[in-house]
Curated annotation (Swiss-Prot):
Its cofactor is [4Fe-4S] cluster. Residues 25-145 form the MTTase N-terminal domain. Catalyzes the methylthiolation of N6-(dimethylallyl)adenosine (i(6)A), leading to the formation of 2-methylthio-N6-(dimethylallyl)adenosine (ms(2)i(6)A) at position 37 in tRNAs that read codons beginning with uridine. SUPFAM superfamilies: Radical SAM enzymes. The gene is miaB. Transmembrane segments: none annotated. The lineage of its organism: Bacteria, Pseudomonadati, Pseudomonadota, Alphaproteobacteria, Hyphomicrobiales. It comes from Chelativorans sp. (strain BNC1). This is tRNA-2-methylthio-N(6)-dimethylallyladenosine synthase. Keywords: 4Fe-4S, Cytoplasm, Iron, Iron-sulfur, Metal-binding, S-adenosyl-L-methionine, Transferase, tRNA processing. Residues 172-404 form the Radical SAM core domain.
Length: 475
């Protein structure tokens, strides 16, 4: 499984608009981890909105509290249990006031821990895995009746067939960019990764279902759509003709939807990057010139131990083909340092591949054994002090590459989608085609506009710019 870790370090509470009246029940959703969890939280909120639940950002006001959890990083479960301890106190205080609070744990920690959550955190009323969110309203109803529920079996039915479509007002409240999950699960079984055990086998949504959801999003004002999957380029969904489509063909179809001006996808596995998908990067102006393509390590010996089933040379040849098709593309990746058995020479191979690719940005982590994965049982675990030193060196190199990429854009003109107000008064923030935050004065246009700007400076992870033209309605 490949996981885009852009939001891995953040935890956000999800505010979802609904159509229920002010007197109806309220739900608070806290989201941990990746973009797919953000999408899942939105869909859970949509399902609950259909049952009269209105979203709130204030946990003290909530009748239902849901933690949508991530299990990728070390101690993920302990972080959840700590949060549940705080929620237990809140639940007890509300009970003294005669106010009922239902507490639920969803996501990958729920799938991995199951009934153990109820044992360790008695304040929890329901535990629900990622494949059964469509059952959430009925599960909540049962929990309100006093039942303790663990719903982590893989559903026979497809949850996407049963989840209600979000209300137009809810979509509008989420902004002009959106996520859309097209693929779930993983069949790769990398030895460091827990996802095949928490998300299950690879499943691809059919074309008609994806297109219908994308059209609804576009009609509600979404201008940039990011397709999500644990291995999104492994997507092979049923087309309208009953035949199997690949991700490249799907992108060509989505590019036909009026109002959708920008397309992205994440996260990909090198083994599933086929010619049709590379052609989409070459031919589709709506497909942004940015690709997150993790390699994890630069040593063939470590790649084999990780069960990646490709070599460093395979990866570099693939990068060459992609760049030949789309010369302006910026590459991103993931790296794990300190995998069991990693030697100094293996680590230098990783540093070499980073220099060879020259990433616009990338994410790097110390290896942490995940219970139940083959890597956790391997010998030659690398000492933490060695991991720390290697990670520091790798991150310094990646930071320098990111800084150089940002500075290379100074003086150029780009099309910028204005997404939201900036942190400072009088500013707006958008995203460059290469995914960097770009800050501009608010007189550049309205949120949802695509404007021509000139990059004036680069600082940290962000770019600064000035207007260079007028707002455009569509590409």
């Amino acid at each position: 499984m490949e996981q885009n870790l852009t939001t891995e370090r953040s935890e956000t509470s999800s505010s979802r608009a609904g159509t229920a009246s002010r007197t109806d029940k309220k739900v608070f959703v806290k989201t941990y981890g990746c973009q797919m969890n953000v999408y899942d939280s939105q869909r859970m909120a949509d399902a609950l909105a259909a049952e009269g639940y209105r979203a709130t950002d204030v946990i003290e006001d909530a009748d239902l509290v849901l933690l949508n959890t991530c299990h990728i990083r070390e101690k993920a479960a302990e972080k959840v249990y700590s949060e549940l301890g705080r929620i237990r106190v809140l639940k007890e205080e509300r009970a003294k006031q005669g106010r009922e609070t239902v507490v639920g744990v969803a996501g990958c920690v729920a799938q991995a821990e199951g009934r153990e959550i109820l044992r360790r955190a008695p304040a929890v009323d329901l535990v629900i895995g990622p494949q059964t969110y469509h059952r959430l309203p009925s599960v909540v109803t049962r929990a309100r009746a006093g039942e303790k529920i663990v719903e982590t079996e893989y559903a026979v039915e497809d949850k996407f067939d049963h989840l209600p479509a979000p209300e137009r007002t809810a979509v509008r409240s989420r902004g002009v960019t959106a996520f859309l999950t097209v693929q779930e699960g993983c069949d790769k079984f990398c030895t460091f990764c827990v996802v095949p055990y928490t998300r299950g086998a690879e499943v691809s949504r059919p074309v008609a279902q994806i297109v219908a959801e994308a059209e609804r999003l576009a009609e509600a004002g979404v201008r940039e759509l990011t397709l999500l999957g644990q291995n999104v380029n492994a997507w092979h969904g049923e087309g309208p003709d009953g035949r199997e489509w690949g991700l490249g063909r799907l992108l060509f179809r989505l590019a036909e939807i009026p109002g959708l001006d920008r397309l992205r996808y994440t996260t990909s596995h090198p083994r599933d990057m086929d010619e049709e998908l590379i052609a989409a990067h070459r031919d589709l102006i709506k497909l942004m010139p940015y690709l997150h393509l993790p390699v994890q390590a630069g040593s063939d010996r470590i790649l084999k131990a990780m069960n990646r089933k490709h070599t460093a040379a395979d990866y570099l040849r693939l990068i060459e083909r992609i760049r030949a098709a789309r010369p302006d593309i910026a590459m991103s990746g993931d790296f794990i340092v300190g995998f069991p058995g990693e030697t100094d020479r293996d680590f230098e191979d990783t540093m070499r591949i980073v220099r060879d690719v020259n990433y616009a940005q990338a994410f790097s982590f110390k290896y942490s054994p995940r219970p139940g994965t083959p890597g956790a049982d391997m010998h030659d675990q690398v000492p933490d002090a060695v991991k720390d030193e290697r990670l520091q060196r790798l991150q310094a190199l990646l930071a320098e590459q990111q800084r150089a990429f940002g500075e290379s854009l100074v003086g150029t003109e780009i099309d910028l989608l204005l997404e939201k107000p900036g942190r400072q008064a009088g500013q707006l923030v958008g995203r460059s085609p290469w995914l960097q935050p770009v800050i501009v004065e608010e007189n550049a246009g309205q949120i949802g506009d695509i404007v021509r700007v000139r990059i004036t400076s680069s600082g940290g992870h962000s770019l600064f710019c000035e207007p260079a033209g007028t707002a455009r309605v569509a590409l």
